Regions:
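Histidine-acidic metal/acid-base catalytic patches
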Residues: 1-7, 15-32, 91, 145, ...
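Hydrophobic faces of well-ordered beta-strands that scaffold small-molecule active sites
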Residues: 4-10, 34-36, 69-74, 112-114, ...
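N-terminal-biased segments
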Residues: 9-20, 48-58, 95-97, 195
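Short histidine/acidic/glycine/proline-rich micro-motifs that form metal-
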Residues: 10-14, 40-47, 118-119, 155-158, ...
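Active-site acidic/histidine proton-transfer and metal-coordination neighborhood
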Residues: 20-21, 27, 61-65, 78-182, ...
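Glycine-rich, proline-tolerant flexible connector loops at the mouths of alpha/beta enzymes
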Residues: 35-63, 116-123, 222
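Short active-site-adjacent helix-start/loop capping segments
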Residues: 42-45, 70-71, 78-82
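Short glycine-enriched, charge-decorated loop/helix-capping segments at active-site entrances
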Residues: 45-50, 85-89, 127, 224-229
Length: 238
């Protein structure tokens, strides 16, 4: 038995593929599962209002292909952040999260990843941090009711770019259903910034890590770095 399972993020595949084709492509490439995306586009958010029949079609495709959708990335909460000063954005963020947990429950998804931002497009303040914590506690309660793990992703900005910072919120929320979904690329860049050790930082989250996002980075560059051209030590992290 393998020590871990390896998943493929849906957005790594062409958007023109239907669900059965995406699952078949992931299986053919040797992956163990697929991660579904709920990003800030209205097209992806609309998935949260799929009919029971549409949900069943996805389940059917998973069984026919033999490839599960096991995790979900709710990056829509970057725009509709849980600490946002705009009440309507905060409210929509919580609605998106609640519906995401419902969809995850229907599809048999175990882990729902949410970005570790109090705000993204706006300035981070004491108030946005307090609001984020308040809503994160509510989110943890929703996850508890659904029996699904929430995973805080470590991001690229100062608010939550290390496991140590994410552990603060795991501790304050005090829920068995709120854990950490570290991004090893972001952690590596943070380690360069702070002159710290990536593995030591990950050790601070032992027992509280649901998954590991395998992403390549370079100092100061967080996206679109091809594997093998950056500075992330994947072997050591895994």
């Amino acid at each position: 038995m393998k020590k871990y399972s390896l998943g493929l993020y849906e957005k790594a595949m062409p958007g023109t593929l239907d669900w059965k084709e995406k699952l078949e492509a992931a299986k053919e490439a040797g992956y163990d599962f697929v991660e579904i995306s709920i990003d800030a586009t209205e097209e992806k958010i609309a998935r949260l209002d799929m009919t029971k029949e549409d949900r069943f079609e996805i389940i059917k495709a998973m069984y026919e292909v033999g490839m599960p959708i096991r995790t979900m990335c709710v990056s829509a909460l970057t725009k509709y952040s849980l600490g946002n000063d705009k009440e309507e954005y905060c409210k929509r963020g919580m609605e998106i999260l609640e519906k995401s947990l419902r969809l995850a429950d229907d599809l048999g998804i175990r882990v729902v990843m949410i970005p570790g931002y109090d705000v993204y497009y706006e300035p981070s303040t004491l108030e946005t941090k307090k609001r984020f914590l308040k809503n994160l506690k509510k989110a943890s309660e929703l996850a508890e009711k659904a029996g699904i793990q929430l995973g805080l992703e470590t991001m690229e900005n100062e608010f939550m770019n290390t496991v140590e910072k994410a552990m603060k919120y795991v501790t304050l929320c005090n829920s068995n259903y709120l854990k950490i979904y570290p991004d090893i690329g972001n952690l590596t860049n943070a380690a360069v910034t702070y002159q710290s050790d990536v593995l030591e930082d990950m050790e601070l989250g032992r027992g509280n890590l649901t998954s590991l996002h395998l992403k390549e980075t370079l100092p100061g560059r967080f996206r679109e770095v091809p594997y093998g051209t950056g500075h992330v030590d994947f072997e050591a992290a895994i």
